Amino acid sequence: MLLLLFSKTVRRILAVLVLIPVVVFGATAARVWWVARQDDRPHSDAIVVLGASQFDGRPSAVFKARLDHAAALWRDGIAPRIVTVGGGRVGDRFTEAEAGKRYLATVGVTDVVAVGVGSDTLQSLKGLSELYKRQGWKSAVLVTDPWHSLRSRRMAQDLGITAATSPTRTGPANDSRTTELRYVARESAAYLYYRVFHRSSDAGPRAV
């Protein structure tokens, strides 16, 4: 009898231990999905475009979608300037930030600051926070893909920036339900990784 009771207790404990991470991941995925659908546009010190792949100064489709959205926000008077962020790889002639700045100039944006550091989101935002400290800026509207919004906002806030997100609704990250589900799953894992280790999990090839 005691052995049977012990066995049932162990099974219940194991079930709870299995269920907890499932619930945590599910709740995080719901937050990623919810924040992805929000479009916050408070008047801010700057509109910040998070970097993505560029090819010899030409923004990839993902990056171009972000830049076009940021330009539209700038024309609407959301902020007096746009800041592009993102470093480069060995052999690149341009950083992501520089490529973004060059592109924005071609579409008529007259005040762009390039912060060409960082090979992942956290490193780029650390570079941004240094610029903010030097300039005395406080607030930002972050422009990125919808599923990246929660994690990038959390990182910026942890670095002392009052951050809102206005994600792009165009580009490859928004092209199908399958793509959306894949990004939600990936970003949920990346967000949890950041909250536990306070490190970025997205070092490596940028989105194209």
Regions inferred by a protein language model and the residue ranges of each:
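A transmembrane-helix-recognition feature enriched in membrane-embedded lipid enzymes
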Residues: R177-G204
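A structural signal for short, hydrophobic/glycine-enriched beta-strand patches
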Residues: A29-A185
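Enrichment for repetitive, rod-forming helical segments
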Residues: V18-L19, Q38, L73, D158, ...
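Extracytoplasmic/luminal low-complexity segments enriched in Pro/Gly and acidic/polar residues
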Residues: A207-V208
